[in-house]
Regions:
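Short, surface-exposed ligand-recognition loops at beta-strand->loop->(often short) alpha-helix junctions
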Residues: 9-17
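An amphipathic, aromatic/His-enriched active-site/gating alpha helix that lines ligand/cofactor pockets
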Residues: 24-36, 55-89
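A contiguous binding-surface segment within folded domains or other stable secondary-structure elements
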Residues: 17-23
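Anionic, Ser/Thr-rich low-complexity intrinsically disordered regions
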Residues: 2-4, 19, 74
């Protein structure tokens, strides 16, 4: 199982446009095979920042979700929309049976 966490700091004049594009990702992504959950939210203390957290069965599910056209749309606008580099971390949440 993989967990993806991304934080995006939008330019103030691009924040609403980015939020609208991000909103288009959630429903189709959740229907993608192998996507366990996906949530995107605005950071309450940083109104121009967004957090995306997703849980995938495996790397193939992550690749399927990231190949969706809605994701490509967001990726296309990120360079002009972000005020800081995209923060992206992928965690391996697989449990070693020897540890249980």
């Amino acid at each position: 199982m993989l967990i993806l966490r991304q934080k995006m700091h939008a330019k103030p004049d691009k924040s609403d446009e980015l939020m609208a594009a991000l909103a288009e990702i959630s429903t189709p992504a959740r229907a993608t095979e192998g996507v366990i959950s996906l949530d995107i939210a605005r950071v309450l203390t940083e109104p121009d920042s967004f957090i995306a957290t997703a849980v995938y069965e495996d790397g193939a599910a992550l690749e399927r979700q990231e190949s969706r056209p809605e994701v490509h749309k967001v990726m296309a606008i990120l360079p002009e929309s972000l005020a800081a580099p995209l923060e992206r971390t992928i965690f391996d949440a697989s449990v070693d049976p020897a540890l249980v």
